[in-house]
Amino acid sequence: MKTNIVPIANAIFFCGDRVEGSGNPVIERISNLQKLSEIVVSKFGSSINAWVIEASVFNGPFAVYKDFIPSMNQYGEPRSYNPIGFPASTSTVSLLSNCLEEAKKVILRTQVGSRSGCTFACSFSQPKTFILGFSKGGTVLNQIVTELGFSDIGSNVNSPNVGSENTYIVPKTKEDLLNSISDIHYVDVGLNTAGAYLTNHDVFERISKRLMQGAPQLRFLLHGTPRQWNDKRRDWIRNEKDKMLRLLESEVPKSLGKLKVFSRYYFNNMPPSMQMHFEIIESLDVS
């Protein structure tokens, strides 16, 4: 009997805009979707499932996450983050569920004609969820964090829904997803307009309140390079990052020690470049 082991966590990586024909072999290699999934697994361990998500729509090279963010311009830049309808968490759950079903079909087809079977193991603990947003992919994180702040803790925290096997491979509902999130990684995020980082104090106050009411520990990790954090032409990126960091840190004392906040700066002695913007993915410290 060949068993597909249930992961200890699902790591979901949201990509940014496309960079094609750069002529830079480092950028071309790291931006490959298969390579990205391998990097994610190398960071979190082989007992996780890695999911690399691109926008469903592109306007030229610009990623447009229209199914995840309710209000944006034609270039995929958000006008606001609003929890109504929970579009980002709902879309994420739908994507993971569809991908899992396709994976099952592929695995079952490979077993046809062989003596070994294939089963999807059941588990009594729901896997954690790690979410990573790279470059413009950080806008999806902002939307998910907003939805997290406005979501109910619910009775399913640390209480698995017995009898539903998919629950233990990927979250089946937006509540499952939001309540399973333990790590939120902003990876060199940035935009050509405001909105790269979330600066809504109300959202962070609500998240702190959730933690006090029994939600599991939550870590925010902000990873950056000079490419984004030292860009004088887009100084709002650093200003937004600094404000988000201050807002999060102001909630730490209220969270009963369950909110953890980290800021990590990479390649700080190097001049800004597009290459370092991608190399940070390989250099991520997710500990």
Model-predicted regions and their roles:
Residues 37-51, 180, 210-220, 245-261:
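Structural alpha-beta junctions
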Residues 101-217, 227-230:
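Serine-dependent carboxylesterase/thioesterase catalytic core
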Residues 26-38, 85-103, 145-171, 197-209, ...:
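Well-ordered, non-membrane alpha-helical segments in soluble/globular domains
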Residues 1-10, 44-49, 88, 110, ...:
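A domain-start/cap signature at the N-terminus of enzymes
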Residues 52-115, 156-161:
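Short acidic, low-complexity segments enriched in Ser/Thr/Gly/Pro
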Residues 16-20, 56-58, 136-137, 190-192, ...:
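Conserved beta-strand elements of beta-rich interaction domains across eukaryotes
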Residues 221-287:
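C-terminal catalytic histidine-bearing segment of alpha/beta-hydrolase fold enzymes
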Residues 1-69:
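Short, surface-exposed "cap/lid" segments of acyl-processing enzymes
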